[in-house]
Amino acid sequence: MILILLGPPGAGKGTQAKLLSSELGIPHISTGDMFRDHKARGTEIGKQVQAIMDAGGLVTDDITNAMVKERLSRPDVAPGFILDGYPRTVVQAGYLDGLLRSLGRSIDRALSYEVPEELVVERISGRRSCPRCGAVYHVSQNPPHRAGFCDRDDTALVQREDDKPENVRKRMQEYGTKTEPLKRYYRDRGELSDVEGVGTPEGILAVTKKVLGR
C-alpha cells in the first residue's frame, strides 16, 4: 500500500505516519527526516535546507524530488510506504506520479488531515527542544519537570526559529497557496480522503483505518 499524508504543519501527520507504519508494516518516509540528515552531514543540500527553514519557508522542488527519488530506490519500499511531508505542490505530485509509473506503481490513497489554524499555531509555537540531547517538550501538553530546562541534562530549552508564531503563520500561508491545490488534484483523481485531525492519536488512527477499510 502506498499512502500520502497531507495537512498543514502541526497537523499530526508524523504521529499518524508512525502509527500506520507499525500497523501496516511499511516504512514511514518523512522528508523532514531526510532534510535533517542532510543538514547533520553538512551537505550542500543540507546548507540550502537550513537557510530556507530558518526563514520559515518551504524547500524547493528540485531539492526535495532528488531526495525522494533516492529514497524510493531502496528495497525496503517494495511492500509499500507512507509519504509524510511530500508532495507539497502539484508540481511535486506530478513528478511523483511519473516516478511511480516508471517503477510500475501508483498511490492507493491521499489522506488530508484537517486541523484549525489557531490549533496548529498553538501546537507548534509551544514546542521547546534541548540543544544538547534533542529531547522535545511542549509548554502545555508535555512540559519538563522544571520549566525551561531539559529533564535529562538540565540544559536550557530553546524554541526553534521556525516554531515561532509569526513563522508558523507564514508557513500556514505558504501551505494554503502551494499545498491546498493538492487536495483538488487528488480529489479530481478520486484518491483523496479528508480525516479530522483533532483528537487523540489513537482516535485519529481509528478514523484513518476506517477510511482505508482496515
From Swiss-Prot:
Pathway: Purine metabolism; AMP biosynthesis via salvage pathway; AMP from ADP: step 1/1. AMP binds at residues 31, 36, 57-59, 85-88, 92, 160, 171. It is found in: Cytoplasm. The keyword Metal-binding applies. GO terms for cellular component: cytoplasm. Keywords: ATP-binding, Cytoplasm, Kinase, Metal-binding, Nucleotide biosynthesis, Nucleotide-binding, Transferase, Zinc. CDD domains: ADK. The keyword Heme does not apply. Zn(2+) binds at residues 130, 133, 150, 153. InterPro entries: Adenyl_kin_sub, Adenylat/UMP-CMP_kin, Adenylat_kinase_CS, Adenylate_kinase_lid-dom, P-loop_NTPase. Its main location: cytoplasm. Transmembrane segments: none annotated. Monomer. This is Adenylate kinase. It comes from Anaeromyxobacter sp. (strain K). The lineage of its organism: Bacteria, Pseudomonadati, Myxococcota, Myxococcia, Myxococcales. The gene is adk.
